Amino acid sequence: MTRIVHDGDGDTRILATDVRVADSFFARARGLMFRRSFPDGSALVFPFGRPASRTLHMVGVPFDIDAVWLRGGRVEQVSRLSAWTGLGRAVADTVIELPAGAADGVREGDTVRVDDG
């Protein structure tokens, strides 16, 4: 079972257990667009392989999300993106999208990892 794990301030917390990986061009381009919901415990992971400026937009996404930009497993930025109009950008090699509120308590410099079990 793949899960998203947050290590910060001496605590370890599971952020998601229903994890999907956007590992193709089409999956990365679609992201969460046109989905009707994003249940608690879900995550969408965008692995890019190397750090670069990564932009997320919320066009076609009808719900708020939390986005976590990672570089080498360290949190570079955490943002709450608003439905339809949200926009976020940071340098990262991995970006994780979570339901709004799931990344509460995640801070820059913390560790977040995709754990295969």
Where are these regions (language model features)?
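Compact, glycine-rich, soluble single-domain proteins
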Residues: 1-117
